[in-house]
Amino acid sequence: MQKRAIYPGTFDPITNGHLDIVTRATQMFDHVILAIAASPGKKPMFTLDERVALAQKATAHLGNVEVVGFSDLMANFARDRQANILIRGLRAVADFEYEMQLAHMNRHLMPQLESVFLMPSKEWSFISSSLVKEVARHQGDVTHFLPDNVHQALMDKLK
């Protein structure tokens, strides 16, 4: 049986920290679905279609990654995609408390859905899409934190 995992997030935009997690997940699972949440309540900078396109290009070198947008409840999305593993990145203790709540709710909604927590490599442990966007808005250099295509798209958005 194929191990299908979902790595969900808003990915507004996808960072090298996200790529670190998804790359490592591809070594653990047969198929990884990078599930980009519509998240209209977060008021993303990039549209869902833009985020999907940016992530597709950034992960094109990974043969077992599928990038899709979604707006459904995560448990329902996982069931529809026949995935029973949910990948989540943990940067700090504060992340764990929130992620634990999500994991328990997802397990309540879909008992066979296991949450797997991955810590990013040390190099990426402090970055988030929000932080990268904030630094970029103030003309800080965020080149190191983003795939090239994403960096260019962010610079274009901020013009």
Swiss-Prot record:
Query: Where is this chain's protein located in or outside the cell?
Result: Cytoplasm
Q: State the needed cofactors, names only.
A: Mg(2+)
EC id: 2.7.7.3
Please name the top-level EC class of this enzyme. transferase
- Give the residues the record marks as binding substrate: T10, K42, M74, R88
According to its UniProt record, in which pathway does this protein act?
Cofactor biosynthesis; coenzyme A biosynthesis; CoA from (R)-pantothenate: step 4/5
> What is this enzyme's catalytic activity, as reactions?
(R)-4'-phosphopantetheine + ATP + H(+) = 3'-dephospho-CoA + diphosphate
- Can you supply a Gene Ontology BP term from the record? coenzyme A biosynthetic process
Q: Which residues bind ATP?
A: T10, F11, H18, G89, L90, R91, E99, W124, S125, F126, I127, S128, S129, S130
Question: Which keywords has UniProt assigned to this entry?
Answer: ATP-binding, Coenzyme A biosynthesis, Cytoplasm, Magnesium, Nucleotide-binding, Nucleotidyltransferase, Transferase
Its principal location? cytoplasm
Checking InterPro entries in the record gives:
Cyt_trans-like, PPAT, Rossmann-like_a/b/a_fold
**One cellular component (GO) term of this entry:** cytoplasm
Molecular functions (GO terms) = ATP binding; pantetheine-phosphate adenylyltransferase activity
Site positions for Transition state stabilizer? H18
- Subunit: Homohexamer.
Q: Which family does it belong to?
A: Belongs to the bacterial CoaD family.
Q: What does this protein do?
A: Reversibly transfers an adenylyl group from ATP to 4'-phosphopantetheine, yielding dephospho-CoA (dPCoA) and pyrophosphate.
* HAMAP family from the UniProt entry: PPAT_bact
Q: What is this protein called?
A: Phosphopantetheine adenylyltransferase
Native organism taxonomy: Bacteria, Pseudomonadati, Pseudomonadota, Gammaproteobacteria, Enterobacterales
User: Gene encoding this polypeptide?
Assistant: coaD
